[in-house]
């Protein structure tokens, strides 16, 4: 079992258009609605592969009720915390080549009591002895930047492995608490260390510096350049080619889910990275923020190396 905490979940509406032009009327060629938020996506991907996942999240308003229904229908166990506000709705505009323009609402403001209930829900889930607990995504307005750091400390005290996928100050605070795993993307890692990271060598150096701060594993998602895994005794790079990209929404979440699923079922870190890259590549080939099922992942070739070319320039 893997527990996810998503403080700012969403309803994700994905609209496909022929091209995006500012100031013009566009006709949709397709649309879909999915439960969203980083942790929600991780839970969805895990459930699609038969691993029990518990999603702890705030739920309010019509969007919150829809979120619960959609998420439960995917096989995820939902532990909702009732809130007075409404769950946010995000919109993604996707062009035929996979270019995605996202519009994300900030989310509802949680009261002190609602936030306390959310933290209590995560603590209750921790008592069930999961293989991992994962804190994911942005924080709603007004929520203290220490939220994920507190989750890390609680998980470590309970003897549960803990992963964090967020950005900015909440990520920096979580790093200081010493999580087992963080999964920033290229831009988030650059922001965290306060430096541009134009090459794979720069990314590697930045990731290694975080190990000295107490993080045990760093997985950096690099878009079309795959992902880099750095631990105290291992560096590995994995990459897969997507023939027909449809949407990048949720691809990093699928990568994280694949890595966690593999480690929870006994895989070594390198093999877990390969699994994560395959899951992420599969997600890019799917519409909207749909998470990949086993049939989507099967057969995706991943080039995995433990001696990557660190001179690789990471073009956007």
Annotate each predicted stretch with a short phrase.
Residues 47-130, 300-316:
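Conserved N-terminal subdomain of the carbohydrate kinase-like
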Residues 172, 200-316:
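Conserved phosphate-binding/catalytic region of the ribokinase-like
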Residues 108-111, 139-143, 170-173, 191, ...:
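Short, small-residue-enriched loops and turns at beta-alpha junctions
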Residues 2, 52-54, 78, 162, ...:
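Hydrophobic anchor at the start of a short beta-strand
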Residues 44, 89-93, 226-230:
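Short beta-strand scaffold segments in enzyme catalytic cores
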């Amino acid at each position: 079992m893997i527990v996810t905490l998503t403080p700012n979940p969403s309803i994700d509406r994905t609209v496909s258009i022929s091209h995006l032009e500012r100031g013009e009327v566009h006709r949709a060629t397709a649309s879909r609605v999915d439960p969203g938020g980083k942790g929600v996506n991780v839970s969805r991907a895990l459930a699609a592969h038969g691993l029990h996942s518990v999603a702890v999240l705030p739920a309010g308003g019509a969007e919150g009720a829809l979120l619960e229904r959609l998420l439960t229908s995917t096989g995820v166990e939902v532990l909702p915390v009732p809130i007075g506000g409404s769950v946010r709705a995000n919109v993604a505009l996707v062009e035929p080549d996979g270019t995605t323009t996202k519009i994300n609402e900030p989310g509802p403001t949680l009261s002190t009591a609602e936030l306390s209930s959310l933290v209590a829900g995560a603590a209750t889930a921790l008592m069930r002895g999961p293989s991992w607990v994962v804190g994911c995504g942005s924080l709603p307005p007004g929520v203290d930047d220490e939220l994920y750091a507190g989750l890390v400390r609680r998980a470590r005290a309970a003897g549960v492995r803990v992963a964090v996928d967020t950005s900015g100050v909440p990520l920096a605070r979580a790093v200081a608490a010493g999580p087992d795993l963080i999964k920033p993307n290229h831009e988030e890692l650059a922001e965290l260390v306060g430096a541009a990271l134009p090459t794979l060598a720069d990314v590697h150096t930045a990731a290694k510096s975080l190990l000295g701060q107490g993080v045990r594993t760093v997985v950096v998602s690099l878009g079309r350049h795959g992902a880099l895994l750095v631990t105290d005794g291992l560096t590995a790079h994995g990459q897969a080619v997507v023939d027909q990209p449809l949407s990048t929404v949720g691809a990093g979440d699928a990568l994280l889910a694949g890595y966690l699923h593999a480690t929870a079922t006994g895989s070594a870190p390198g093999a877990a990275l390969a699994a994560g890259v395959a899951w992420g590549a599969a997600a890019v080939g799917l519409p909207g923020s749909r998470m990949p099922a086993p049939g989507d992942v099967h057969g995706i070739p991943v080039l995995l190396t433990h001696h990557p070319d660190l001179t690789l320039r990471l073009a956007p």
